[in-house]
From Swiss-Prot:
Protein's recorded name: Ribosomal RNA large subunit methyltransferase H
EC number in record: 2.1.1.177
Similarity comment text for this entry: Belongs to the RNA methyltransferase RlmH family.
Species name: Methylorubrum extorquens (strain PA1) (Methylobacterium extorquens)
Subcellular location: Cytoplasm
Role played: Specifically methylates the pseudouridine at position 1915 (m3Psi1915) in 23S rRNA.
Keyword line: Cytoplasm, Methyltransferase, rRNA processing, S-adenosyl-L-methionine, Transferase
Quaternary state and interactors: Homodimer.
Residues given in the record as S-adenosyl-L-methionine binding sites: 109
InterPro entries: Alpha/beta_knot_MTases (IPR029028), RlmH-like (IPR003742), tRNA_m1G_MTases_N (IPR029026)
Gene Ontology cellular component list: cytoplasm
Amino acid sequence: MRLLVVAIGRLKNGPERDLAARYRERAVALGKGLGVTACDLTEIPESRARRSADRIAEEAAAILALVPADAAVIACDERGRSDWPSERIADKIGAWRDAGRSTLVLVVGGADGLHETVRGRADHILAFGAATLPHGLVRVLALEQVYRALTILAGHPYHRGDPEA
């Protein structure tokens, strides 16, 4: 399975970019033993359309053009579900991998959010809590959760889980 993060906007040099790169590199290294062939990042330039509706529609077309037909898609959106623990995310990724899905695409929208066509294509819509977060930080959180999910699947001690369980 190939992992692909599709994000609107380009991260400037700084701590968010460094953390995103670190988690992506860790996912690639750990994923090799789990059937993960790559963890790629594609940055789509922010639309320059004047109206918000036009911007998110243009960005949606660019996002969906990168999503393979048989891909599993997780959209990161503030209107998504925030009740999925990391173990459940790992279970879903493992199930998609075991079902032969070629790619897992994580989508991070821009400042205007995600168009309904992207939300409709998603297998799951994930929120990182009720707060609105900068999309650069969401990208880091998405990559950290991918890495954490892989550590759970591998039985790696990075994720210690609930000590009471």
